[in-house]
Amino acid sequence: MFFKKVSLLVLLIVSLSINAQIDAENLDNLVKETLQTFDVPGISVGIIKDGKIVYAKGHGIRSLTNKKEMNENTLVGVASNSKGFTCFALAMLVDAGKLNWDDKVRKHIPEFQLYDAWVTEQFTVRDLVTHRSGMSLGAGDLMFFPEGNDFTSKDVIKNVKYLKPVSSIRSEFTYNNNMFIIAGEVLKRVSGLSWEEFIETKIMNPVGMTHSKASYNRVTDRTNIIDAHTRAE
């Protein structure tokens, strides 16, 4: 049901935006209905057509505490959508001839080690970003969640060998966050820039995303940023 609702929302927004003129009033009403349907405090919507922003608006509130309204400039965390930035960044290095998708991870991170010696030696950059490590959904997530603990990417690399597989390598799609943390470390070692520095200087800034930051900790002005919320049982 959740997927159907999301699909319907996307289709409706697309249908409202295919014309040269955006029907802002209908779109506003749709977003308001969406807020009620999903029971969320706020949402930001942006539509780009032919390289131009034709709709940008915040709806609802950014915090249940202060009740301040969302607007088109409110900073919102993108969570796992950041994985797309990681893949894009790695692809830039591949295009530049500095990296290959089928490079062994140990070529760039010699201390990398998984649950099995053979798997460790065969594991590639492609494996890191295609969720086929063989480890279970959510395996090792407590190494970096909740945000604010003192674990680093080096700690993840050191401890990922203790995570047990639930399937053989490349046999199944099993979503795993830690492999992307390690992919970020590959990016750092090949480019000489931290993941955050690369994302901001090579991707965000060149396309005008100067108001965006690669992580919450890099946001210096927090006067217009959302609070994280969760439903109380």
What residue ranges belong to the model's regions?
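N-terminal signal peptide c-region/cleavage motif recognized by signal peptidases
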Residues: 15-19
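Short, surface-exposed loop or secondary-structure junction motifs
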Residues: 59, 117-233
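Active-site SXXK
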Residues: 28-31, 45, 51, 59, ...
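Short, conserved catalytic-motif segment at the N-terminal edge
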Residues: 22-76, 100, 158-164
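Short, glycine/proline-biased beta-turn/loop segments that scaffold the active-site neighborhood
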Residues: 101-116, 206-207
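N-terminal secretory signal peptides that target proteins for export/translocation
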Residues: 1-3
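Sec-dependent N-terminal signal peptides
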Residues: 5-14
